[in-house]
From Swiss-Prot:
Pathway this chain belongs to: Glycolipid metabolism; diglucosyl-diacylglycerol biosynthesis
UniProt-recorded name of the protein: UTP--glucose-1-phosphate uridylyltransferase
Catalysed reaction, written as an equation: alpha-D-glucose 1-phosphate + UTP + H(+) = UDP-alpha-D-glucose + diphosphate
Gene source species: Staphylococcus epidermidis (strain ATCC 35984 / DSM 28319 / BCRC 17069 / CCUG 31568 / BM 3577 / RP62A)
UniProt KW tRNA-binding keyword: no
Length: 288
């Protein structure tokens, strides 16, 4: 069985929920404290043992490439000024993994974005990490899925429970047999109408997929939102080869919408030893 060494991070979306901030800045570069959101995703992949990452980008996304590239002039300035701690942080972001880029020329959905990276992946199993979900866990969320793949040899989709009132916002599974946190799946449903979801186990932006998924993506018809949905292709593949769902451990932060982004920023700031006390004092004086 081939080890998983490659990952895809889709980052071609327009970020309309954050306009006008994202008119010229990629949504993925919006910072949680002092790091852009996409760096948290790359760090998770790197900690899981991923060596090669392809980021699927679009127009006006060059800042992502610049962030993970060397910037010798900046490094020289920091070194000359004796700012070793900042120098280490800057160099760290460039050494996380081998990072490559491909453009999604049309906005045709997540499934289309994944298919755009087919040549990079080749005939290997691979991971997918979506940038809207930051997960804090002792074992990286994607590594938990990779471990299930190594046990079973089958594709694995990361899920977590959500309130029933929110199921229409996600892809949702209809689980059958369960072993620990691993589920066999009868059906994958993309954004079910409110009140019709088969469970409250929602797909949460982490996948380990076998290369056969590309065969299904190539012939996948448009689905929800008139886009090529990855969930629909996974559902078709599941009818031919078992696809598992895994309820991974960890705290998930939704940074794909404004309220979740603000909540994440506050929670991370409250954990930061340099600012937590001052922030707590500030919040207290707001008298809310």
């Amino acid at each position: 069985m081939k080890k998983i060494k490659k990952a895809i991070i889709p980052a071609a979306g327009l970020g309309t929920r954050f306009l006008p901030a994202t008119k010229a800045m990629p949504k993925e570069m919006l910072p949680i404290l002092d790091k852009p959101t996409i760096q948290y995703i790359v760090e998770e992949a790197s900690k899981a043992g991923i060596e090669d990452i392809i980021i699927v980008t679009g127009k006006h996304k060059r800042a992502i490439e610049d962030h993970f590239d060397n910037q010798k002039e900046l490094e020289m300035v920091l070194e000359n000024k004796g700012k070793a701690d900042l120098l280490e942080k800057v160099q760290y972001s460039t050494d996380l993994a081998n990072i490559f880029y491909v453009r999604q020329k049309e906005q045709k959905g997540l499934g289309h974005a994944i298919h755009t990276a087919k040549q990079f992946i080749g005939n290997e199993p691979f991971a997918v990490l979506l940038g809207d979900d930051i997960v804090e866990s002792d074992t990286p969320a994607i590594k938990q899925l990779m471990d299930v793949y190594e046990e079973t040899g089958h594709s694995v989709i990361g899920v977590q429970e959500v309130p029933e009132s929110d199921t229409h916002r996600y892809g949702v599974i209809d689980p059958s047999a369960k072993e620990g946190s691993r589920y066999e799946v009868r059906q994958f449903v993309e954004k079910p109408k409110q009140g019709t979801a088969p469970s409250n186990l929602a797909i949460m932006g982490r996948y380990v997929l076998t290369p056969e998924i590309f065969d299904y993506l190539e012939t996948q018809q448009e689905g929800a939102g008139n886009e090529i949905q990855l969930t629909d292709a996974i559902e078709r593949m599941n009818s031919k080869q078992q696809v598992y769902a895994y309820d991974f451990e960890g705290n998930r932060y939704d940074v794909g919408e404004k309220l979740g982004f603000v909540k994440t920023t506050i929670e991370y700031a409250l954990k930061d030893p340099e600012m937590s006390q001052d922030l707590k004092a500030f919040i207290k004086q707001l008298d809310i």
